């Protein structure tokens, strides 16, 4: 455990940020799974939006976001 006051604060903030990041990533995965279970235009838009939000927040790399969206788009076109 941290001894310095600023380190204690940073540790607390890290825990909070980790929870936010985990929730955002989980929401992205849930949206993708919902689309894969039942491909539709509406679910594609929701999944694509979730991927973009995760990429903007730095949770996933931009190339992974692009790759995931391309795969979803290909599945929608089928």
Swiss-Prot record:
GO cellular component, one term: small ribosomal subunit
Record's keyword annotation contains Protease: no
Top-level taxon of origin: Bacteria
Keywords assigned by UniProt, alphabetized: Ribonucleoprotein, Ribosomal protein, RNA-binding, rRNA-binding
A single GO molecular function term of this UniProt record: structural constituent of ribosome
Function: Binds directly to 16S ribosomal RNA.
Family label: Belongs to the bacterial ribosomal protein bS20 family.
Name listed for the protein in its UniProt record: Small ribosomal subunit protein bS20
Record organism: Streptococcus pneumoniae serotype 2 (strain D39 / NCTC 7466)
